[in-house]
Swiss-Prot record:
PANTHER family: SERINE PROTEASE INHIBITOR, SERINE PROTEASE INHIBITOR KAZAL-TYPE 1. This is Serine protease inhibitor Kazal-type 1. Serine protease inhibitor which exhibits anti-trypsin activity. In the pancreas, protects against trypsin-catalyzed premature activation of zymogens. In the male reproductive tract, binds to sperm heads where it modulates sperm capacitance by inhibiting calcium uptake and nitrogen oxide (NO) production. Disulfide bonds join 32-61, 39-58, 47-79. It comes from Bos taurus.
Length: 79
């Protein structure tokens, strides 16, 4: 009984540590709006999954309109 309890506790700890770790590997989609007049000139950098730092999410969205494969946001801030 004691061995089973230790095994169960160890399994629960390992599962909680693994959690959602794979969700951030690819990145998240940019929140794109239909900017008719272009993007705002606000510097709020994001790092794309292509390794490029974009000045803001809007500029990443504009880049995605030109690409076949969309770039995701790997992290907030510069690459």
């Amino acid at each position: 009984m004691k061995v089973a309890s230790i095994f169960l506790l160890t399994a629960l700890v390992l599962m909680s540590l693994s959690g959602n770790s794979g969700a951030n590997i690819l990145g998240r989609e940019a929140k794109c709006t239909n900017e008719v007049n272009g993007c705002p000139r606000i510097y709020n950098p994001v790092c794309g999954t292509d390794g490029v730092t974009y000045s803001n999410e809007c500029l990443l969205c504009m880049e995605n309109k030109e690409r076949q494969t969309p770039v995701l946001i790997q992290k907030s801030g510069p690459c």
